[in-house]
Amino acid sequence: MKRTIIALACVALAGPALAQSLGEKTGVNSALGVAPSTADFVKQVAISDMFEIESSKLAQQKGNAQEKSFAQQMVTDHNKTSTELKGLVNDSKVQATLPTALDSSHQSKLDKLKSATGKDFSSDYNSYQVSAHEEAVSLFERYAKGGDNAALKDWAGKTLPALKHHLDMAKNLGKAPSVGQSK
């Protein structure tokens, strides 16, 4: 009887911790506007930065002129945010573990980009950039409003304008100006 009660107590207490990670992973937190846990935020930001950098390095090789220009800025800016995030974690201002590799979802997108060429590459790269930046803006907005680590919350708020600018730029990839129009 005691073992059953102890087991049930462990399951009940583990629920909220598991729910936060599961909620972020499944998009439930985003849909509800709930701030991610610090560990989830750090993990998602690090993976997003790795994907942005690696996919944009491919775009620098395979993309059109507009994509190459955008990709250069993505590599520069996301290297900067990666360095800043690592600094926060390494300075012990944030208690979290940085991932060292992409998750399976981002890795499969990167693999698809590696094998794509021409218009297929452009279509996939442009689409991935929009969705990645929409997710990043949501993630940073939610953490900046409701995150539980002051240093990371402040950093998220300061980084958000650049991510919104990236999203606007990504939405314009592949949209050439009409005749007589300048961009």
What are these model-derived regions, one by one?
Residues 9, 14-16:
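N-terminal signal peptide c-region/cleavage motif recognized by signal peptidases
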